[in-house]
């Protein structure tokens, strides 16, 4: 971890740990990819342009703001088993469908300037990329949950949590 954090653009690497009784990855492969999660668009770069990170301890305040539009950037199955109560489920099968969903929403220019767009996903990757797309589309007040749902569930006491249901992960944790 120390070595990875010494690399350019990885200084603030957010490492996630979770315990498991059995091997979480039956067959682990490590591949170098150009993108971790593809949106299918070349001009979207969260390193150059992204929304504002919101730490888990500040997330509930953003959700309680009436000017906040909360968007779940995960696929339909993930949304169906758990989400934040007031979130919008885009009903997408995969992340590449997210831009098309946004374009169908017909947000007004006033909405783009005044509404707060808050997005979340499992670990923070899809919502960070989605925030870059939203900024690219002219939205000014774009936020995403730092570390994703997993970090929120790790840090926020269940009594204060606004999460309802389960959080799907792609392994056997």
What does each model-identified segment do?
Residues 59-65:
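Short amphipathic alpha-helices and their capping/turn segments at secondary-structure boundaries
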Residues 69-73:
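Short hydrophobic beta-strand that contains or immediately precedes a catalytic carboxylate
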């Amino acid at each position: 971890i120390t070595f990875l954090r010494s690399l350019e653009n990885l200084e603030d690497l957010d490492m996630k740990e979770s315990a498991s009784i059995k091997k979480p990855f039956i067959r682990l492969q490590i591949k170098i990819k150009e993108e971790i999660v593809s949106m299918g668009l070349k001009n979207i770069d969260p390193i150059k342009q992204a929304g504002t990170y919101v730490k888990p301890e500040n997330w509930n305040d953003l959700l309680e703001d009436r000017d906040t539009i909360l968007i779940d950037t995960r696929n339909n199955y993930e949304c169906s088993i758990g989400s934040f109560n007031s979130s919008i489920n885009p009903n997408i099968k995969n992340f590449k469908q997210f831009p098309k969903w946004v374009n169908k929403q017909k947000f007004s220019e006033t909405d783009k300037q005044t509404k707060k767009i808050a997005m979340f996903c499992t670990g923070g990757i899809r919502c960070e990329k989605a925030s870059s797309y939203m900024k690219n589309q002219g939205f000014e007040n774009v936020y995403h949950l730092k570390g994703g749902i997993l970090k929120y569930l790790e840090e926020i006491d269940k009594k204060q949590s606004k999460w309802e249901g389960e959080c799907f992960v792609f392994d056997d944790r």
